[in-house]
């Protein structure tokens, strides 16, 4: 297997094809990584969540990293890593834009709400839309030697 860099355009193409990534945030030198569903738009990712550890941490330290990939097998894969800034959407128009973008996936709202309901007895769940403003992005691809 060879590992090669992929272009910026290939990174964007991958982010358009996948909808799940691993979001890393940190607070007081402690990292926290969780899977999230997202939708890509040039220079941004849009995400829907509920109030929990990641939101609390990102409100205090908005610098984040996200990794997303598409894996065929151990020798055929593509991966993108991006660094960016968490921006909580507060204006109605911004939230509606994020909701419209996320609605391309029929189940975009289910995971955060289902997870939250299982962890709390108080069902007063605060929906939160946020954006990750992308500062940098790079990617790699694993290629089988047979190719």
Feature locations, PLM:
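Charged, gly/pro-rich active-site loop segments
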Residues: 2, 74-147
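Active-site-adjacent structural patch at catalytic or cofactor/ligand-binding sites
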Residues: 50, 60-69, 78-87
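Short beta-strand segments
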Residues: 18-50, 66-67
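Short, structured patches in soluble enzyme cores that scaffold and shape functional sites
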Residues: 27, 68-70, 133-136
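Extreme N-terminal tail/first-helix region
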Residues: 1-17
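A generic secondary-structure signal marking the coil-to-beta-strand transition
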Residues: 11, 19, 62, 78, ...
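Short acidic (Asp/Glu) patches
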Residues: 49-52, 64-69, 109-118
């Amino acid at each position: 297997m060879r590992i090669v860099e992929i272009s910026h355009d290939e990174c964007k193409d991958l982010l358009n094809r996948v909808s799940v990534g691993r979001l890393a945030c940190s607070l007081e030198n402690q990292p926290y990584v969780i899977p999230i569903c997202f939708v890509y738009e040039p220079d941004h990712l849009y995400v829907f969540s509920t109030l929990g550890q990641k939101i609390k941490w990102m409100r205090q330290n908005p610098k984040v990293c996200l990794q997303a990939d598409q894996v065929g097998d151990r020798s055929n894969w593509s991966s993108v890593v991006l660094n960016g800034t968490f921006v909580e959407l507060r204006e109605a128009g911004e939230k509606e834009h994020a909701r419209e973008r996320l609605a391309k996936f029929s189940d975009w709202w289910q995971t955060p709400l289902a997870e939250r309901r299982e962890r709390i007895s108080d069902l007063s769940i605060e929906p939160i839309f946020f954006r990750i403003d992308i500062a940098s992005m790079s990617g790699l691809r694993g290629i089988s030697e047979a190719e």
